[in-house]
Regions:
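Register position in tetratricopeptide repeats
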Residues: 73, 107-111, 138, 172, ...
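Hydrophobic/aromatic packing residues within the alpha-helices of TPR/SEL1-like helical repeat arrays
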Residues: 43-50, 84, 142, 149, ...
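Residue-level recognition of tetratricopeptide repeat
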Residues: 60, 94, 159, 193, ...
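Conserved alpha-helical positions within TPR/SEL1-like repeat arrays
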Residues: 65-72, 96-107, 161-171, 183, ...
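Conserved structural position within tetratricopeptide repeats
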Residues: 52-55, 86-89, 147-154, 184-188, ...
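Terminal, low-structured helical/coil segments at or just beyond the last alpha-helical repeat
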Residues: 206, 210-240
Length: 240
């Protein structure tokens, strides 16, 4: 199978995101679902720099945010969550603080649960439903992370990534219909959101709606996620 020929997608842009990045004023700051490519030594150096700034004067929420980010990236999750909470106390109406605290809380759960191997991510598999079923044995809860995203959505209802992140956590918690709704909302806000199409497709396969799931995976492939075509091939082979 080959990706269909489609017009270039219009980039998803929100002025509020740009304004936030400008307010922080950090060249390293970016909105991304990928792993950071900043060297560990650089992260440690930046973290020490933020500590010095915080000790030298009254804490600014912007510096607290920056330190919370570096703490998260060096896997000091508890300290990171605490630092985000301090930033939120100073700026409780900023949705990006809740978004990042949610992400850190989820990463902390993922890290802890990976130690006892009782947790599985949604990923490409011959039977994605089996992956989700494995989560029933997991005792960890994403409730606090979801609560942060509820707050972020309330403060910034046009932010597709908040719905997408919440959908991921709902899916991993086994709330597939609710996850489907959030993926759909994210797609309505950002029609070129390839990852949302992909994950919604997987969710629909898990809910046994193979036709609509296949359509979403095909769309994800058109938008650049070539792995979606591999999932389609696997399901086609299972049906034959």
């Amino acid at each position: 199978m080959r990706p269909d020929s489609v017009p270039a997608a219009k980039p998803y842009h929100l002025q509020r995101v740009d304004d936030f990045k400008k307010r922080i004023g950090n060249e390293y700051l970016t909105l991304s679902c990928r792993e950071s490519n900043i060297a560990p030594d650089t992260l440690v150096m930046l973290d020490k720099q933020y500590v010095q700034e915080l000790n030298a004067s009254n804490p600014a929420w912007t510096v607290l945010f920056e330190r919370a980010v570096t703490q998260s990236l060096i896997k000091q999750y508890t300290n990171s969550v605490s630092t985000y909470s301090s930033a939120i106390e100073l700026n409780p109406s900023n949705p990006f603080l809740y978004l990042n605290r949610s992400t850190t809380r989820a990463e902390m759960i993922d890290f802890i649960s990976s130690i006892d191997n009782s947790y599985q991510r949604i990923t490409i598999d011959s039977d994605p439903a089996n992956r989700l079923n494995n989560n029933s044995k997991r005792t960890y809860s994403y409730d606090e992370a979801v609560a942060d995203l509820n707050k972020a959505v309330k403060l910034f209802p046009d932010f597709a990534y908040a719905y997408y992140n919440r959908a991921n956590l709902l899916a991993l918690s086994g709330s597939l219909p609710e996850a489907f709704e959030d993926y759909t909302k994210a797609i309505s806000l950002n029609p070129a959101f390839a990852e949302a199409y992909y994950n919604r497709g997987i969710i629909q396969l898990c809910m046994k709606d193979t036709r609509k799931g296949g359509l979403d995976l095909s769309k994800a492939g058109e938008l650049g996620i070539t792995e979606a075509y591999e999932v389609l091939k696997r399901y086609a082979s299972l049906d034959n």
